[in-house]
């Protein structure tokens, strides 16, 4: 089923803003009575990847779920290989199914998913909060509220929706207010071209901006490589690295210093974990990105993060802080400027069925499939 959840404020990206977040909720029932939970989620409809929750739901119902029904849940790797062999692309839909499978497997063997991914390196992840209203005063106030509440210790400014000169004034003003208190990163979401990015580097770096994320179009790895050679700030690639092949190309071309991991874009936790290994082998660090997941997907992100040795810049897994309502009995825990690993088998979460019913889209078809 699709659930539609309100946001606490508009989340402004370079090209559009989100007022709510929609998620495809997936339940996988085993013959032994275990229920695996997953979600597929994408912000603002199809602008980021071409996927929408409506298309994701249809793909799962008509093409992916029939390939899963009757299979042993413990054979999660083989099941996912089967899906990849029969259905091209559709990473977001596949990620939700893999999440439900791994949640079920974890519950069957009584172990959290990070154990299935190789074990735990950490129980918390430092959090960066997105500043995305476009108003400097509001953004500064929001940053200090998050700092004082212990929810986040770094901030990422969404850029690209305003003219460059105005955006730079905004960034420099916020950097000045945060100086000595918190670090600042910026994300133009592909809105700039290479010359614009080169013009922006000097003032941003002089202001102490530590990360610049995906300034140019996702396909332009050559430009990313040139920017990376020029920049003193860490260059983070996101839209430009969505598959394991993409990751190998980024390493080969030295097109960034930091790779954004997102479970949805890679098609699941296991391919995201493999992407981290490719990046690390190429001398790059990784970063936990977000698609504004609910506490379901946030738990999956934290299970993945727990299994990764080095995350020097943490991540921005902040969906439950921005989404006004939650689908879990115990929402994700944020304290000491970090997201904490949930306890328990699988994802470590339990659905709040009243909340699910409250926010379920009336026309949504339930995705409720049975495995072995």
UniProtKB/Swiss-Prot annotation:
Which pathway does this chain act in? Aromatic compound metabolism; 3-chlorocatechol degradation
UniProt-annotated binding residues for Mn(2+): 187, 213, 238
Q: What is its EC number?
A: 5.5.1.7
Q: This protein's superkingdom?
A: Bacteria
Task: Answer yes or no on keyword Isomerase.
Answer: yes
Q: Return the Pfam families for the record.
A: MR_MLE_C (PF13378), MR_MLE_N (PF02746)
As its record notes, the protein acts as a catalyst of:
2-[(2R)-2-chloro-2,5-dihydro-5-oxofuryl]acetate = 3-chloro-cis,cis-muconate + H(+)
Q: Look up the record and give one Gene Ontology term from the biological process aspect.
A: amino acid catabolic process
Alphabetical UniProt keywords:
Aromatic hydrocarbons catabolism, Isomerase, Manganese, Metal-binding, Plasmid
| Name the UniProt record assigns to this protein | Chloromuconate cycloisomerase
Q: Which species expresses this protein natively?
A: Cupriavidus pinatubonensis (strain JMP 134 / LMG 1197) (Cupriavidus necator (strain JMP 134))
């Amino acid at each position: 089923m699709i659930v539609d959840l309100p946001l606490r404020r508009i989340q402004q990206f370079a090209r559009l803003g989100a007022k709510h977040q929609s998620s495809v909720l997936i339940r996988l029932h085993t013959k032994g009575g275990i229920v695996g939970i997953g979600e597929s989620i994408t912000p603002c409809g199809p602008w980021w990847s071409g996927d929408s929750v409506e298309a994701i739901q249809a793909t799962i119902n008509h093409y992916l779920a029939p390939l899963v029904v009757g299979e042993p849940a413990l054979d999660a790797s083989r099941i996912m290989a089967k899906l990849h062999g029969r259905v091209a692309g559709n990473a977001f839909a596949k990620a939700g199914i893999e999440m439900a499978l791994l949640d079920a497997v974890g519950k069957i063997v009584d172990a959290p998913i990070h154990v299935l991914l190789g074990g735990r390196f950490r129980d918390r992840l430092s959090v960066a909060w997105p500043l995305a209203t476009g108003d400097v005063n509001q953004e500064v106030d929001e940053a200090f509220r998050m700092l004082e509440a212990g929810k986040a210790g770094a901030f990422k400014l969404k850029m690209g929706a305003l003219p460059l000169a105005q955006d730079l004034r905004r960034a420099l003003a916020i950097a000045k207010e945060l100086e000595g208190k918190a670090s600042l990163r910026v994300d133009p979401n592909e809105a700039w071209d290479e010359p614009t990015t080169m013009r922006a580097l000097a003032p941003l770096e002089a202001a102490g901006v530590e990360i610049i994320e995906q300034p140019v179009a996702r396909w332009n790895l050559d430009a990313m490589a040139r920017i990376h050679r020029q920049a003193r700030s860490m260059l983070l690639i996101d839209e430009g690295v969505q598959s394991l092949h993409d990751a190998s190309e980024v390493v080969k071309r030295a097109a960034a210093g930091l790779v954004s991991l997102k479970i949805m874009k890679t098609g699941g936790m296991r391919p995201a974990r493999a992407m981290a290994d490719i990046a690390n082998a190429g001398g790059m660090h990784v970063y936990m990105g977000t698609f504004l997941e609910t506490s379901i997907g946030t738990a999956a992100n934290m299970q993945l993060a727990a299994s990764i040795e080095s995350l020097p810049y943490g991540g921005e897994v902040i969906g439950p802080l921005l989404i006004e309502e939650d689908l879990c009995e115990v929402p994700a825990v944020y304290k000491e400027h970090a997201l904490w690993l949930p306890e328990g088998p699988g994802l470590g979460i339990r659905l709040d069925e009243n909340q699910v019913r409250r926010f379920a889209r009336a026309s949504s078809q339930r995705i409720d499939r049975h495995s072995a």
